[in-house]
Each structure stands twice: as structure tokens, then as C-alpha cells.
A protein has these predicted regions:
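Membrane-interfacial helix-loop segments of redox and metal-homeostasis proteins
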Residues: 2-3, 8-205
Length: 205
């Protein structure tokens, strides 16, 4: 991914598109995240949390309708749409391909951005994609039992933690995998609230 140039927007202002548009995160010159230079792509934590809130609302409505009315059409459709949305984020981040990510970015467009590392967010989106895809496959195959509901409730819990509390559980897991030397990214994760702070990997020193 190319590094930022003087033509890139200021990190002090929110913007709808990353540069280049098909990158998961944005690169900036002279940006620091939690006291260290951000030599890695970043995303706007506020937009991520807003998007998580939208997904949480959709998932909650779908599961409630399935549970109380025994109508599984909404959960079948929403699970497919959410899985597709998270898949698109793996390609181009929150914008412009992800409809929910774009909506989340739009909702916080007038707020000062809070930049965090994109790598661990991509890991979190991959986990959410896997869960949504599993729900989509099972519900569209006619499986609507307790197991599917538990997967859905777990996903809602993770989204609630992200959007309401501001704690990304998957990002924390990602940082623990680094600490256990199970994965070796070039940069240590920079999470919201500095909640997954660890020493920079040897490759980045």
C-alpha cells in the first residue's frame, strides 16, 4: 500500500473515502496513534463503531422476529447481506463498497476522527463475516434451532461491546495471538482506547 503524500486529506478531519479507494485503511504522514508513529493503515474508530451499531440493530430485529413470530425470512436475508458487507470490507475497508460501512462513515462525518490500526479491524471483520456466513448458510438451509440463535446472540454481544462500550473483543484476541507469537504482523495493533497495547513485533523494530 502506497504511503500518504501531501495530496492526501488531513488526519484531523473525517473523510468519506480512503486513498486509494480500494485500500482497507488510510495512510498518513506524521500521524501518531497512542504515542507512537502510525506507520500502518488506519481506520476511523468512530465510523467503525457506528457501523457496528447499525449491524447490531439489524441483527437484533432479525433474531427478535425469528424468536417471537417464528418468521425466519428477515434473518435469512439480513444474514446474507451482513456477510456480504463484511466480505466487501476485506477488500476496501469501510468505504465505498460496504453499504453499512459507508453509512457508518456518513453518520460520524462531522466528528473528529479517532484513528486506530486497520489490521486488527480487518481481523475482527473476518470473524464477523464467518459468523454471519454460518448463520446465512444454516438459516437458508432450514436450520433455525438454538445453536443458530446462540451464534446470532454472540455476534450481537460482540457488536454491542464494539459500538456501545468501545471495546473490540476480536481486536483484543488479535493482540493476544501476537503476544503468544502465533501471528507475526509487521506492526503492533493500535486499538481504540489503547485497549490491546503490546510491544511492537520484532519485524517492526
Amino acid at each position: 500500500m502506497a504511503r500518504a503524500s501531501s495530496s492526501l486529506p488531513s488526519p484531523d478531519k473525517a473523510h468519506m473515502l480512503t486513498s486509494p479507494w480500494n485500500s482497507v485503511g488510510q495512510m498518513f504522514d506524521n500521524l501518531t496513534v497512542w504515542g507512537r508513529p502510525a506507520r500502518f493503515p488506519v481506520v476511523n474508530e468512530r465510523a467503525v463503531r457506528a457501523a457496528a451499531g447499525v449491524v447490531m440493530a439489524l441483527a437484533t430485529i432479525a433474531i427478535a422476529i425469528a424468536y417471537f413470530d417464528k418468521n425466519y425470512t428477515p434473518i435469512r436475508i439480513i444474514a446474507v447481506l451482513v456477510a456480504a458487507d463484511y466480505a466487501l470490507r476485506q477488500v476496501a475497508g469501510l468505504t465505498p463498497l460496504s453499504p453499512i460501512g459507508t453509512l457508518g462513515t456518513f453518520l460520524v462525518r462531522n466528528q473528529t476522527p479517532e484513528w486506530v490500526g486497520a489490521t486488527q479491524k480487518r481481523f475482527a471483520w473476518a470473524l464477523a463475516f464467518a459468523m454471519a456466513l454460518l448463520i446465512a448458510i444454516l438459516t437458508n438451509a432450514g436450520v433455525h434451532g438454538l445453536g443458530v440463535q446462540l451464534i446470532g446472540l454472540t455476534l450481537i454481544g460482540l457488536l454491542w461491546s464494539e459500538s456501545v462500550v468501545g471495546f473490540c473483543v476480536a481486536c483484543f484476541i488479535y493482540s493476544r495471538l501476537i503476544k503468544a507469537d502465533l501471528i507475526r504482523p509487521e506492526d503492533a495493533p493500535a486499538c481504540g482506547g489503547n485497549s490491546c497495547a503490546i510491544a511492537a513485533p520484532a519485524a517492526a523494530r
